[in-house]
Amino acid sequence: MKILYAYRFQNNEYDIIEFLNKFKELNPDENFKEIDEEYLKKLLTGVIRNQQLIDNLIEKYSKDWPLSRIPMVELELMRIAIYELLFEEEIPISVAIDEAVDLSSIFGVEKAPSFVNGILGSIAVNEVKRE
């Protein structure tokens, strides 16, 4: 989430993978050793490539909340979770939602967990087609 959050402020100077490499270089204290870097790259690239679809779903289910009103932390968490819901079938639906809700309770505003849970739950029920 930190990488996507920071990426939004860089004015398209780098593509997401270049930005990831720069982020790692500038943040040596971050522990990247325990992260599956291939999955991270796939996730970041997938979120960026599918952002329009993902954002359309967020707008569809966040009644009366345009994207511009949603705090950026919550928005990035939902983008990641929605990407996982739609494109990463090996990740259980409940895991994708629970991770986003848990992180929103740590990094988001007070009512973020219920907001994030409501939107992701609606998307999971109405938009996710898994076998």
From Swiss-Prot:
InterPro entries found in the cross-reference section: NusB-like_sf (IPR035926), NusB_fam (IPR011605), NusB_RsmB_TIM44 (IPR006027)
Residues forming coiled coils: none
GO molecular function: RNA binding
Similarity comment text for this entry: Belongs to the NusB family.
Keywords assigned: RNA-binding, Transcription, Transcription antitermination, Transcription regulation
Protein name as catalogued: Transcription antitermination protein NusB
Gene3D superfamilies per the UniProt record, alphabetical: NusB-like
SS bond list: none
GO biological process, one term: DNA-templated transcription termination
Function: Involved in transcription antitermination. Required for transcription of ribosomal RNA (rRNA) genes. Binds specifically to the boxA antiterminator sequence of the ribosomal RNA (rrn) operons.
GO cellular component, one term: cytosol
UniProt organism field: Caldicellulosiruptor saccharolyticus (strain ATCC 43494 / DSM 8903 / Tp8T 6331)
